[in-house]
Amino acid sequence: MLAGRAARTCALLALCLLGSGAQDFGPTRFICTSVPVDADMCAASVAAGGAEELRSNVLQLRETVLQQKETILSQKETIRELTTKLGRCESQSTLDSGPGEARSGGGRKQPGSGKNTMGDLSRTPAAETLSQLGQTLQSLKTRLENLEQYSRLNSSSQTNSLKDLLQSKIDDLERQVLSRVNTLEEGKGGPKNDTEERAKIESALTSLHQRISELEKGQKDNRPGDKFQLTFPLRTNYMYAKVKKSLPEMYAFTVCMWLKSSAAPGVGTPFSYAVPGQANELVLIEWGNNPMEILINDKVAKLPFVINDGKWHHICVTWTTRDGVWEAYQDGTQGGNGENLAPYHPIKPQGVLVLGQEQDTLGGGFDATQAFVGELAHFNIWDRKLTPGEVYNLATCSSKALSGNVIAWAESQIEIFGGATKWTFEACRQIN
């Protein structure tokens, strides 16, 4: 009798289980359990199933908590390691960033811009530090060559003697840098020796930089206002020059300049003119592997210029609003022309004219990847289309060469920022 009752109990329990789920979970399995005779067998089975589910959930939560504890411990260990490394880096940065350093290209970085500066100096590896010192030496040598050119033009024996003294100092510094590079390659020298050697070299560089700056200041006081060039030695988002004057409304223009660059890929942006509501009102740019382009009201024409060979080149672009006709000249010869470039759109007035950077906003929003790297001089703008003969006179430094009637190249009208420099330059005397 008891066996029959147990069989009926299992059968009823199976029916309850089958009736409580609508999904098919595969082959049916029967579970027998002891329950009182007068108990509700279906309710008992459901309660048992709920208890099993709760037990399973508790086990899963326990496993999750254990895994999270392990993760937290691992992350704490990682944080300790990173904190230690950061402390070492900060200590090394403090040693490397002494007050007597002479660094080319400035060291300033615009906060919050989110742009790549690409010109900040490395603060950790000794080899990269020596590379930066080498760049500084090269920059000082170039400035010295300009002083030498100036002394030849003015036949000053005092300037010549100073030039010889500075050249001797530069030669000594080059020997010190070369010796330090050889020591690094042989694996000699510890961190203390590195710091001491670098301090000596940078102290000499600082002294040399100050002396050349003094000579250049005296040179600037004596040179004509248009006999200068701008130099942008590094691709950064903070090195640029600004023209104090703005442009009037123009229905035609000619823009000409001397350029020298060996930057690759792309020489960057020699100049950009932005107005409220249009950052690309007038832009000359070559970036990436694209050819040089002229933008007017954000409309583009590709130009046939090839100028990144490290030599001086004279370039001009003319444009008229009627049919958007344009012409491009390199070294006095027309190399390309076209039409339908922003036709019937006059150049808007009251904008900001920047040399060396492309503007994403009015007067700012610079991007290092589009910055100009090289040298620029005799930037002039006219409010008309120059003739081929007039362009040729400019490229050959003829006595008949004209100055821009809208923007004329004058040192007093150019402000420099972020480490850009002004050096003496005379077109056709220093060409290549």
Curated annotation (Swiss-Prot):
Pfam families: Pentaxin. Binds 2 calcium ions per subunit. It comes from the Eukaryota. Coiled coil: none annotated. Residues 1-22 form the signal peptide. Ca(2+) 2 binds at residues 358, 360, 370. It is found in: Secreted; Cytoplasmic vesicle, Secretory vesicle; Endoplasmic reticulum. Ca(2+) 1 binds at residues 280, 358-360. Its cofactor is Ca(2+). GO terms for molecular function: metal ion binding. Glycans are attached at residues 154, 193. Expressed in brain and kidney. Disulfide bonds join 256-316. Residues 226-428 form the Pentraxin (PTX) domain. Keywords: Calcium, Cytoplasmic vesicle, Disulfide bond, Endoplasmic reticulum, Glycoprotein, Metal-binding, Secreted, Signal. One of its GO terms (cellular component) is transport vesicle. The keyword Ion transport does not apply. Homooligomer or heterooligomer (probably pentamer) with neuronal pentraxin receptor (NPTXR). May be involved in mediating uptake of synaptic material during synapse remodeling or in mediating the synaptic clustering of AMPA glutamate receptors at a subset of excitatory synapses. This is Neuronal pentraxin-1. It comes from Mus musculus (Mouse). The lineage of its organism: Eukaryota, Metazoa, Chordata, Craniata, Vertebrata. The gene is Nptx1.
